[in-house]
Amino acid sequence: MTLAVMLQGTASDVGKSVLVAGLCRIFHQDGLRTAPFKSQNMALNSGITPDGKEMGRAQIFQAEAAGIAPDVRMNPILLKPTSDRQAQVVLMGQVATSMDAVSYHQYKPRLREQILAVYQSLAGEYEALVLEGAGSPAEINLRDRDIVNMGMAEMAQCPVILVADIDRGGVFAAIYGTLALLQPQERARVKGVIINKFRGDVALLRSGIEQIEALTGVPVLGVMPWLDVDLEDEDGVALQAGKYHRTDRRDIDIAVVHLPHIANFTDFNALAAQPDVRVRYVRDPQALADADLVILPGSKNTLGDLCWLRESGMAHAVEQARQRKVPLLGICGGYQMLGETIIDEVESGLGTQPGLGVLKTVTHFAQHKTTTQVQATLGTNLPEWLADAAGLHVSGYEIHMGETRREAGSPPLLQLHKAGQSVEDGAISDDGLAFGTYLHGLFDSDAFTRALLNGLRQRKGLAPLDSALEYARYKTRQFDRLADAMREHIAIDKIYAIMRQHQEPLC
């Protein structure tokens, strides 16, 4: 019978996703076939499974921690906000529809049977499942139709561990208040608490822990310190909180424009891990002044973010950077914005809109969504400063609802190899300083990333660095560091005991 445990939080961004990854790593290290599961995820960071299905990035990196390939069953429902009130609904890896919050809340009960079937299929293949909730289980206005917190725990008949973030303050009130707002049968499922992101001497917490255990009857299983572990974040909360705001100087300064609807900012984790690079997410046009490379990232609302670029003055700042001969890269939505024209008769109804005019491309939005993993080769017609990247093999994935065509004579950036065919992708500007592509995950390819960075170093008169960071090994070390820290600070033996004690047959 499958062992299972669910991590729920007192709020969003308390560290559930990272701790789930840590448990997946620990169980994997202990020889258990383990998989993560989150019934419903709301995030703009998504990725593609080997069979071309779209799912949340959090469950992808949790699967990596467990030593397995991502499977869309690990995240059957993905909600991708397109505005403050509307979200694209992705079911089992494919776009189903778009809904506002009220409509989706009414629709959720229809999904319960499908969620349970998916969960049961995973339970039949794995020895341990680590479930993740969303936000807080104490959202009493959503309780009656819940499918991701206590509603999911009930379906899976699994115990719950509550995660609380002490760094934001009020941790004991958050624990007590969350438990107080749960129904008795829900509260009975909570078998432990983990206090996360602690800075300081844990002895100072001892009396508080004793009191909260006495008040609630729920044991505190551990206090996790604030860890400097480089793992992916689930959504834009970390960007808003300034987690990625770096002030230290590095040889290469890369400015990623922080679009209002930024998507897949995990593209730049591999860049940020490089020893000679500072990656900044910027909204102030003046912040582009010192950049050695400007990146327009992916977007879930290309035309809305293009409008913001102009209204905020960022488009003018990008043009000024171009005049200073600063290289410019657009990825996915950012690539679309760099073109001459965007024709949208599908999403916004805005019709034909001018792009930034940097690349000689025209984009037509379409109903069909391209979702695929691809292998690719860099073109041989790259500009001199990027010549070391010519012919290199890279890999990544595509997620976009649109097709971009180049003008005749405008060179592509990549040759994509998919379904037995070679397809041109991306574009390069006439001056060789601006380029775009639909390929996400490009910087995970070590040789390309080092070639790009050495090209930027050359432009600054700096000597190249010979060795490339092996990003896959780097991530593995981060997973192992996380697991080591959790074994040190959390009673993992008690978590095993909780899981074994509450093994129940699925309904």
Swiss-Prot record:
Where in the numbering of this chain does the GATase cobBQ-type domain appear? 251-448
Signal sequence coordinates: none
* Active site positions, chain numbering: C332 (nucleophile), H440
- Domain of life, source organism: Bacteria
**A Gene Ontology MF term for this entry?**
catalytic activity
Per the UniProt record, which residue ranges are transmembrane?
none
Pathway annotation from the record: Cofactor biosynthesis; adenosylcobalamin biosynthesis
What PROSITE patterns does this protein's entry cite?
A: GATASE_COBBQ (PS51274)
Gene Ontology annotations of biological process type: cobalamin biosynthetic process
Q: Keywords of this protein's UniProt record, alphabetized?
A: Cobalamin biosynthesis, Glutamine amidotransferase
Which SUPFAM superfamilies does the record cross-reference, listed alphabetically? Class I glutamine amidotransferase-like, P-loop containing nucleoside triphosphate hydrolases
What function is annotated for this protein?
A: Catalyzes amidations at positions B, D, E, and G on adenosylcobyrinic A,C-diamide. NH(2) groups are provided by glutamine, and one molecule of ATP is hydrogenolyzed for each amidation.
Q: Which family does the similarity line name?
A: Belongs to the CobB/CobQ family. CobQ subfamily.
What protein is this chain from?
Cobyric acid synthase
Origin species, per record, is Klebsiella pneumoniae (strain 342)
